[in-house]
Amino acid sequence: MVQKNGTMIKIFAPLKIKLSLEGGYIMEYKLVKKDSFVVMGVLKEFSYDSAKTVIPEFWKEHYEKGNGKYVCGMFGVNIDEPMAGSGTFKYMIADAYNPAMDIPEGFITKMIPEFTWAVFPCRGAMPDALQDVNKKIFSEWLPALKEYEFAAGYCIEMYDDASKYPNGNEDKNYYSEIWIPVKKK
């Protein structure tokens, strides 16, 4: 309100309506039973709060150090085995382990247990396409499940060979997957 010549003038701010709809789309996935398997790679601990920015940096450092000649990075393995809510997890840049090869210094092997995995395809440039699907899995898909629940503290990213795409893993058609272990409720 403003006073003009002793009288009050009223101003009406226009009403704005904001509507936000979430969900309402079909998440593509398949259930796949996989035997246990062993991966080899480099492992580092991260905070969930900073993971979205620091894990892409971990990948960048991996290749800058020349570690891509040992492990090209077929998998990104999120390991939170105790699932204790500590706010941290271990992340491994890994390949399937070939027992005929030596394990380079600074690398480890990790056995991934047998599970039924919900496998989600991701299409698009990294890391945004993968992070978008991952967010939908944990904020919308998992909470809405009626028949299954999260089975263990693993989340695996599987990456296609980037050399098959004109713009590598930044290509709009780049393919990757997210694997989530599930079990019947």
Predicted regions span which residues?
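A solvent-exposed interaction/effector surface
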Residues: 2-185
